[in-house]
From Swiss-Prot:
<keyword id="KW-0689">Ribosomal protein</keyword>
<keyword id="KW-0694">RNA-binding</keyword>
<comment type="subunit">
    <text>Part of the 50S ribosomal subunit. Forms a cluster with proteins L14 and L19.</text>
</comment>
<dbReference type="Pfam" id="PF00297">
    <property type="entry name" value="Ribosomal_L3"/>
</dbReference>
<dbReference type="InterPro" id="IPR000597">
    <property type="entry name" value="Ribosomal_uL3"/>
</dbReference>
<comment type="function">
    <text>One of the primary rRNA binding proteins, it binds directly near the 3'-end of the 23S rRNA, where it nucleates assembly of the 50S subunit.</text>
</comment>
<protein>
    <recommendedName>
        <fullName>Large ribosomal subunit protein uL3</fullName>
    </recommendedName>
</protein>
<dbReference type="GO" id="GO:0006412">
    <property type="term" value="P:translation"/>
</dbReference>
<dbReference type="GO" id="GO:0003735">
    <property type="term" value="F:structural constituent of ribosome"/>
</dbReference>
<dbReference type="InterPro" id="IPR019927">
    <property type="entry name" value="Ribosomal_uL3_bac/org-type"/>
</dbReference>
<keyword id="KW-0687">Ribonucleoprotein</keyword>
<dbReference type="InterPro" id="IPR019926">
    <property type="entry name" value="Ribosomal_uL3_CS"/>
</dbReference>
<comment type="similarity">
    <text>Belongs to the universal ribosomal protein uL3 family.</text>
</comment>
<dbReference type="InterPro" id="IPR009000">
    <property type="entry name" value="Transl_B-barrel_sf"/>
</dbReference>
<feature type="modified residue" description="N5-methylglutamine">
    <location>
        <position position="151"/>
    </location>
</feature>
<dbReference type="GO" id="GO:0022625">
    <property type="term" value="C:cytosolic large ribosomal subunit"/>
</dbReference>
<keyword id="KW-0488">Methylation</keyword>
Length: 210
């Protein structure tokens, strides 16, 4: 199943098993995911559904967005996401996906936008080792060192790890244990940490490697 749910990262807490074992969990709030469009091979070249969730102020909704949501007959949400469909899966515009979609799932993949760290050096960004703090080393404690050769090849290879912007990129953490599905409060409790900051959007899917 490629269908997932779009939720909001509330934060972390812990729960206890009957044996008294403490399990750290991330709480994901999943408001109803409303289907705004159903794409098909005939019209779009592939099968997928487009969903929205949450709410957005009317003053923040553009006219094209307002028309799109009105055509689907659903309330404007805080964004649009897409999930590919397998052959045989059918959905209708206006239908809702809720947390019970994952009721029988044990492991999930969670996708989010990692916390931005700004401009970071190679030690923080790529885990480079530092050079000696003493023993004759001056001003080269955290420098990356050589970035290549001389005349041959006479250039720096693509992908060379250097200092630069760190974080604020799409990240997926795989095979996280789904500890609990709270259908009454629309919550997912996932063991461990998930990418992103508090209140960030996350996508929860059944694990592809489970």
């Amino acid at each position: 199943m490629t269908i997932g749910l779009v939720g909001r990262k509330v934060g972390m807490t812990r729960i206890f098993t009957e044996d008294g074992v403490s399990i750290p969990v991330t709480v994901i709030e999943v408001e109803a995911n409303r289907v705004t469009q159903v794409k098909s091979v005939e019209t779009d070249g592939y099968n997928a559904i487009q969903v929205t969730t949450g709410a957005k102020k009317a003053s923040r909704v553009t006219k094209p967005e307002a028309g799109h949501f009105a055509k689907a007959g659903v309330e404007a949400g805080r964004g649009l996401w897409e999930f590919r469909l397998n052959n045989g899966e059918t959905f209708t515009v206006g239908s809702e996906l809720k947390v019970d979609l994952l009721a029988d799932v044990k492991l999930v993949d969670v996708t989010g936008t990692s916390k931005g760290k700004g401009f970071a050096g190679t030690v923080k960004r790529w885990n480079f080792r530092t050079q000696d703090m003493t023993h004759g080393n001056s001003l080269s404690h955290r420098v990356p060192g050589s970035i290549g050769q001389n005349q041959t090849p006479g250039r720096v290879f693509k992908g060379k790890k250097m200092a630069g912007h760190m974080g604020a990129e799409r990240v997926t953490t795989q095979n996280l244990e789904l500890v609990r599905v709270d259908a009454e409060r629309n919550l997912l409790l996932i063991k461990g940490a998930v990418p992103g900051a508090t209140n960030g959007n996350v996508i929860v899917k059944p694990a592809v490697k489970a």
